[in-house]
């Protein structure tokens, strides 16, 4: 029996789940709105809320905790500057999950998870690979 066990396994291993939520959290902070399956969106919500709370707290320790979770310095900078400033007066409830019908291929229930009061211009930002920094340049 699985009484009192919180969270969904989503059919993947724990390391896969951790990496998936890291990638989804980075995408959510970068684009401020993403489309995914409904169970993944519902599981991503507390992860994103805790990261935004870290951004609001500020300070070096909170920044290191956020970097340990996200592993992307540009996204951590956006989290601690723009997003933290936007939600400084809001006590939680930074994200919303909207149902978005079903996926054509397998009829999976889809959802849009977005930041409340989001920046609409952030939606289509380039998500391609970043150019590698050349270590020989000085």
UniProtKB/Swiss-Prot annotation:
An annotated Gene Ontology molecular function: structural constituent of ribosome
InterPro entries with a match to the protein in the record: Ribosomal_bL17, Ribosomal_bL17_CS, Ribosomal_bL17_sf
Record's GO cellular component terms: cytosolic large ribosomal subunit
A biological process from GO: translation
Pfam families given in the database record: Ribosomal_L17
Stored Gene3D superfamilies: Ribosomal protein L17
Record's keyword terms, sorted: Ribonucleoprotein, Ribosomal protein
NCBIfam families: L17
Similarity comment: Belongs to the bacterial ribosomal protein bL17 family.
Quaternary context: Part of the 50S ribosomal subunit. Contacts protein L32.
Protein name, UniProt field: Large ribosomal subunit protein bL17
Native source species: Granulibacter bethesdensis (strain ATCC BAA-1260 / CGDNIH1)
